[in-house]
Amino acid sequence: MKEIMTDIKLRTWKMNKGRLAKLFIILLLISIMTMLFLYLKDYRVKKYMLNNNKFDVIDIDNYEVFLTGETHTMAKSDEFKKKFFYYLNKNAGVKNIIEEVGFCSGLLLNKYIQTGNEKYLNFYMEQLKGTMAYNKEKYEFYKWLYEYNLQLTEEDKIIIYGIDIEHQPLTAIMGISTLIDINKEVPQSLEEAIEYVKKNDHNAILYLKLAYDKNKEECEEYFGDNFIIFENCIKNLYPEETGSDMRDKVMMDNFSFIYSLNRDKKFFGQLGSEHIYQDYINSDYTSIDEVRFGILLNSNNSPVKNKVYSLLCVYQNINDNSPSKNSFDYSLIKNYKEDIFVDLSQENSPFYKKKYFFKDKKRAWVTCDYIQGLMILIDSNETTSL
C-alpha cells in the first residue's frame, strides 16, 4: 500500500510539473508576443515619423491659422519660429503674424517692422525687463523680421498683431501713439488724453477711456480710418473677460477682430504651448477645466473652425532636464540626436488612432485631437537675457 501511495504521489508531482512547465511556456509565449506586438507597434509609429518629417508634407492649403507652441525659456524656439514662418510665407503666402503680446503693444512692434525705427523696438524690449521675454533671441527675431520685410513688396509686407492681454501699460500707450496724426487738430474732448499719450504717462489709459465714453463721435473723426483699431485698444485696456483662462478668451476676442479685417487671409503665431492645444487637457501649468486659445479657434463659433494647424515644440535634452516631463511622454523620441519635424496628420497616421506623447489619461482622445504637428528640438540652451 505504501508503495502504491508513493507511486501516486510521484505521478501527481510529475503531472503538476508538466502542467507548470506548459503554463510557463504559455506565459513566456504571451510575454514574447506582447513584447513583439509592442515593438512592431512602436516600429510602425517611428517609421511613420521618419517618413513624414518635412514641412512640405503639411497640407497648407487646408489651413488658415498655423499655431506653434513653445517653452518660452528655450533658445531654439525663436530659431524654429524664424524657419517655420519663412516656409509659410514663401509657400502658403502667410504674412499676418499674431504675437503673444497685448493688442496695443502689438501696434508698436508692427510700427518697428514697417519703419525700422530702433526707438520702437528698444522701448518695447526695455519694458520687458525682469521677465523671461527680455532676451537676446526675441530681440534678434524682430530685427530679422524687419530686414526680411524690407525685401518684400508693399502688397506682401508682413503685419504683426498682438492678441494677448496688456501686460506692459507703457508699451500699450506708446502703441496707441502710433495711431496719432500729429498734424491733425485735436478736439477738446481728447486734448488731455492725447497730451498724456505723447508724454507716455499712465494717466493716458484713464483719459482715453473717458474721452471715448464721453464723445465717441469726436474720437471717430479724429482717428479716422484708425478708429476701429483705437476702439479695440480701449476694449483691451478695459477687458470684460474674467476667470483663470481670461487670457485665452481675450486672445480669441482679438483674433476675431483681426480676422474681420483680414477675412480669408492666413495667420501664423508662436505662443506658449499651453495656448495651442485644440482640446481640454491636464498639463504642467493648466488644468483640464481651462479653455485654450486653440480650443476656441476650433470651436463652432470660430470663423476658422477646422482650419487650424497646431504644432507643439518639445525639447529633448540629453542631460535629462527636458521641460514638461510630468505631462509629456518622451519615450518615442528619446533616441533622436538631431532636430526633427513630424507631421502627425497624414492619411493612416497612428496619431489619429491613439493618444501618444501626452500622459494625461482623463480624456480618451487621440493625439491629433490636440495637435497636428511636432517639432523635436534637441539640446536647446536657455535664452540669453539682454
Question: At which residue positions do the language-model features occur?
Answer:
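Compositional signal for N-terminal targeting/processing segments
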Residues: F24-L27, S31-L386
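Residue-level detector of intrinsically disordered terminal segments
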Residues: I4, K14, I32-T34
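Short, isolated positions within intrinsically disordered regulatory regions of eukaryotic proteins
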Residues: M5, M15-K17, Y148, D369
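N-terminal Sec-pathway targeting helices
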Residues: K9-I30
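N-terminal targeting leaders characterized by basic, low-complexity, disordered sequences
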Residues: M1-D7
